[in-house]
Regions:
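Bacterial N-terminal signal peptides that target proteins for export
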Residues: 1-9
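N-terminal "domain-start" segment that seeds a small globular fold
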Residues: 32-70
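Structural microenvironment flanking redox-active thiols in thiol-disulfide oxidoreductases
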Residues: 91-129, 140
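Bacterial signal peptide processing site
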Residues: 22-25
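Short active-site neighborhood of thiol/selenol oxidoreductases, capturing the structured segment around
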Residues: 69-91
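Hydrophobic beta-strand anchors of alpha/beta hydrolase catalytic cores
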Residues: 79-80, 110, 156
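C-terminal motif of bacterial Sec signal peptides marking the signal peptidase cleavage site
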Residues: 17-20
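Thiol/disulfide oxidoreductase modules built on the thioredoxin-like
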Residues: 127-132, 140-186
Length: 186
């Protein structure tokens, strides 16, 4: 009798373990309409005004403790990379993501959005993966993850220059990221 009870529990734990860092789910379509949309507000920055899409109207703190305003991303395509420090898929994406950030510097934004752990582990991940050339938000409470309806790490949300989601999904090893950004900057 004990085996009948124990077996389903073991199978459940095993299946959750196999899921690991999340699925390889891929959605080339924009996120649902309840996520940040194209609604815009005018923000004054440096004396000028810029249209700030609703999607970019958020604030946070970087893993280095500096304030971050999503409005600073307005006007350029933006890659939001949602990762967790303990995630092997995220580590595999790090080099390609850093390469894209360098390749498209000044043409597109790349921002890491770290979650599902503490800030010390997040800083260690950035140091260990060599991804410190672009900003990483410390989203310990999941505010930015929820805003973009991200439910698992190792996902990318790519916004066009108008703040519209043009891609949301997993790119194993970051493969294909450069092509997606090139299509928005060319």
């Amino acid at each position: 009798m004990r085996t009948r009870t124990l077996l389903p529990a073991v199978l459940t734990v095993a299946s959750l373990t196999l899921v690991g860092c999340g699925g390889d789910g891929d959605s080339g379509a924009p996120a649902s309409t309840s996520s940040p949309s194209s609604a815009k507000a005018t923000a004054s920055e440096g004396g000028g005004s810029a249209e700030v899409p609703e999607a970019l109207r958020f604030t946070g703190t970087t893993v280095d403790g500096k304030p971050f305003d999503g409005a600073s991303l307005a006007g350029r395509p933006t890659v939001l990379w949602f990762w967790a420090p303990w995630c092997p898929k995220c580590r595999a994406q790090a080099a390609e993501t850093a390469k894209v950030a360098e390749e498209y510097a000044g043409k597109a934004n790349v921002v890491g959005v770290a979650g599902l752990d503490g800030n010390d582990a997040m800083r260690d991940f950035v140091d260990q993966t060599g991804t410190g050339s672009f900003p990483h938000l410390s989203d310990e409470d999941g505010t930015v993850w929820k805003r973009f309806e991200v439910t698992e790490q190792s996902r990318y949300v790519i916004l066009d220059k108008d703040g519209e989601t043009v891609y949301e999904g997993v790119l194993p090893g970051g493969e294909g990221l450069s092509g997606k950004v090139a299509g928005l900057t060319g």
